[in-house]
Every structure is written in C-alpha cells, then in structure tokens.
Amino acid sequence: MGQKVNPLGFRLGITTDHRSRWFADSTKPGQRYRDYVREDVQIRKLMSTGLERAGISKVEIERTRDRVRVDLHTARPGIVIGRRGAEADRLRSELEKLTGKQVQLNILEVKNPELDAQLVAQGIAEQLASRVAFRRAMRKGMQSAQRAGAKGVRVQCSGRLGGAEMSRSEFYREGRVPLHTLRANIDYGFFEARTTFGRIGVKVWIYKGDMTEREFAREQASAAPRARGRADRPRGRRDEGAAPQQAAAPAATTGTEA
C-alpha cells in the first residue's frame, strides 16, 4: 500500500499538514465546499502560470470569513516579488479578482532547495527538456540531495526515455526510503518534462529521517508565527548564484519497470 499511495496524503497529521486550511458548511453559492475546492485549484494554477523560473515548491491556502491568506514557498523570491514589488502586486490583484476577497500574499523562501522533492523534480525535468541524458539528470539530482543531508533518495522517470519507441519507467535509489513507515519524514514531488518525444513524468522521494508527533506539533507551532505578518518578504537569504560542486556518482540502486 505504501508503494502506491501519495506519501504526503498518507502521512497527514503525522509528519505532514494540510496545504488548504478552511471550513465550509454554507449552502450559499460561492461559499460551498465545492466552490472553495475549485477556487483552490484555480489559485494554484494561477501561481504556476508565468512563474516557471521561480522554483515554486508549494502553495498553502488559509481562509477566514472575509480574507484569504496565500503562502507561496519559492526558491527564488526575487523573481516572484519583482522590481519594487511589481510582480507581487500583480499576483495579489489577480488573486483578489479571482476570490472577490482581501488577499494576504506571503512569499517565503525555501532555505534548502536541494532537500525539497518538488524543486528537485522540477530541476530534473528542466534538464530533460534541455536534452540532457535522463540517467545523468537523475544522478545529478540525487547527488545534490545526498550532499544536502538526505538519508535516502529515490528518483523515477517514466515516458519515452531517450526517444525510445516504447515508453518505460526507470528509477534510481540511494539510501533508505521507507514508504510503509508512517513516522518517516518523506517529501514527495512530481513534475512533467515536455520534450520533443512527448511528456516524461519525474517523481522524487526524499527521506529526511523519522519524526515523532511531538516534533511535528513543535514544528507547526513555530511555523505559524513566522508566516504571520511577513507579506511579500522572503524568509532568510540565499546566494542564488552559487552553483553546487560536481561530485563523482556513487553506487546507486537502479531498476526498470516495463
């Protein structure tokens, strides 16, 4: 079961938290549960449109009666904010037009993008779109995650790999990735690479160690005050120009799925 289910949804309330936090019991049009779900999908689609280079990791949405708070986690906050905050103002105005409510937009920087599964998947997909060999791209993403402190990494690519006539799936794994262990802190990301041969799906699992319920509650309690009142400002600084050093590829576990 742990091999098939989404690792994030499988661990809700144990090591992960909901990315949409609101309650709806109204029967009025525009305030029903289905209306909020559709609106959340539209918000996330709007956040990904035109910000492909920003390295967006995840979008968290929280609603009150007359306000919507959107937390945008990104590896490059400067691209999202824009010159003198022009891009952030544009995003906020589009969100207010979409929701019809006051929107609080918080732009938060991902401190360690090499350990973020979604960003690693995006990086591999960008390399595949640039015609880099898929095995080389997979190994490079795994090496960067291992150097950043990951205890285990698994990367899987599915599609017409290398331009082959028949599609297949291949994966590489280093370290431990215990998908059945609920207390295991496993980050999961998926992204599609658009190549000349068609789309190639990239899945990434990163194991960061075990987490107890007490540690999870402490992490949630410390994250709430940091996000409050920091609209349109990145959290922390990071040298975007520094490139990771190249290292020799270690021995890895490989596999092929028909």
Swiss-Prot record:
Superkingdom per UniProt: Bacteria
Basic and acidic residues bias locations: 229-241
Coiled coil: none
Entries under SMART domains matching the protein: KH
Biased amino acid composition, Low complexity: 242-258
Keywords: Ribonucleoprotein, Ribosomal protein, RNA-binding, rRNA-binding
Domain KH type-2: 43-111
Signal peptide, first to last residue: none
Region of interest (Disordered), ranges: 217-258
GO MF, one example: mRNA binding
Pfam families: KH_2, Ribosomal_S3_C
GO biological process annotation, one example: translation
SUPFAM superfamilies reported in the protein's UniProt record: Prokaryotic type KH domain (KH-domain type II), Ribosomal protein S3 C-terminal domain
GO cellular component: cytosolic small ribosomal subunit
InterPro entries named in the record: KH_dom, KH_dom-like_a/b, KH_dom_type_2, KH_sf_prok-type, Ribosomal_S3_C_sf, Ribosomal_uS3_bac-typ, Ribosomal_uS3_C, Ribosomal_uS3_CS
Function comment: Binds the lower part of the 30S subunit head. Binds mRNA in the 70S ribosome, positioning it for translation.
Subunit composition and interactions: Part of the 30S ribosomal subunit. Forms a tight complex with proteins S10 and S14.
Family affiliation: Belongs to the universal ribosomal protein uS3 family.
Name recorded for this polypeptide: Small ribosomal subunit protein uS3
Organism: Beutenbergia cavernae (strain ATCC BAA-8 / DSM 12333 / CCUG 43141 / JCM 11478 / NBRC 16432 / NCIMB 13614 / HKI 0122)
This protein's encoding gene: rpsC
